[in-house]
């Protein structure tokens, strides 16, 4: 059988990434051009700046991905691309590049949901057994997803306000940390003590919804009041207390979901899945099901995960026409 090569594009936020996947399982290249340094001084991603950076580096990323994979343009058999959710201008850059490549080589164009990419990055660890449950935690999303089969995703619980990664960045800014703050807070948390009693919203409610705005507000108020009194609080203890509250919420809701939906596998994915505190809690508290977390290099935004998610769409011949447009608010369906 002829080898199949998927060329995948990811430009939903502030990473420009192009990857090559061979025969559904072998990731030959995963080139990522990060823009973090450009956005640090703003304390967050500036959409216009992100779009311009994507335009500047996308062609080089394509060339590097193909060279690293050791294949020519003519050997590519399909193109996969993130079409949402994300920043509209950023998405359009990846879409333009992907559609141009697919048109020029007369090969299928596969549309991929960015969050499906995060989830299916777990496929890089081992073949996934369905049905499974996924906890997706990132800068823009916090959701529990039931996956009956590859490509069939249903939200069973999600945040009512802030995403967990967003909360990390906001409290990080209050502590004077650089953007993005998640990794630094995780490191500080391991050096501090959980001495502040932050709220764990909705933790006892019999649903699978999350809320982090109350926790974020309590953190900001504590820090602000201390500043007004001239007190200096330890960033280590603040981080440890904040992270403990976040993990208590995530673990409580995940355990409830596993009780409601008996599955054999739990996938934990998204940028926050790189958090060591979360990985430690999962290892200590989830023993009855197999927990699969993508490797660190596939937790953040990258095109490799988009390639993995595109496989099920390709097998179903779920191809897009060249008028495929960006869907910045694209979301999984909610379980009825």
Curated annotation (Swiss-Prot):
GO biological process terms, semicolon-separated: tRNA threonylcarbamoyladenosine modification
Catalytic activity as recorded in UniProt: L-threonylcarbamoyladenylate + adenosine(37) in tRNA = N(6)-L-threonylcarbamoyladenosine(37) in tRNA + AMP + H(+)
Keywords per UniProt: Acyltransferase, Cytoplasm, Iron, Metal-binding, Transferase, tRNA processing
GO molecular function annotation: iron ion binding; N(6)-L-threonylcarbamoyladenine synthase activity
Highest taxon, organism lineage: Bacteria
Similarity-based family: Belongs to the KAE1 / TsaD family.
EC number: 2.3.1.234
Record's subcellular location: Cytoplasm
Name assigned to this protein: tRNA N6-adenosine threonylcarbamoyltransferase
Native organism: Streptococcus sanguinis (strain SK36)
Function: Required for the formation of a threonylcarbamoyl group on adenosine at position 37 (t(6)A37) in tRNAs that read codons beginning with adenine. Is involved in the transfer of the threonylcarbamoyl moiety of threonylcarbamoyl-AMP (TC-AMP) to the N6 group of A37, together with TsaE and TsaB. TsaD likely plays a direct catalytic role in this reaction.
Source taxonomy: Bacteria, Bacillati, Bacillota, Bacilli, Lactobacillales
Main EC class the enzyme belongs to: transferase
InterPro entries: ATPase_NBD (IPR043129), Gcp-like_dom (IPR000905), KAE1/TsaD (IPR017861), Peptidase_M22_CS (IPR017860), TsaD (IPR022450)
Cofactor: Fe(2+)
Ligand binding (Fe cation): 114, 118, 301
Binding residues for substrate: 136-140, 169, 182, 186, 275
GO CC annotations, alphabetized: cytoplasm
Iron listed as a keyword: yes
Cofactor note: Binds 1 Fe(2+) ion per subunit.
Location (main, coarse): cytoplasm
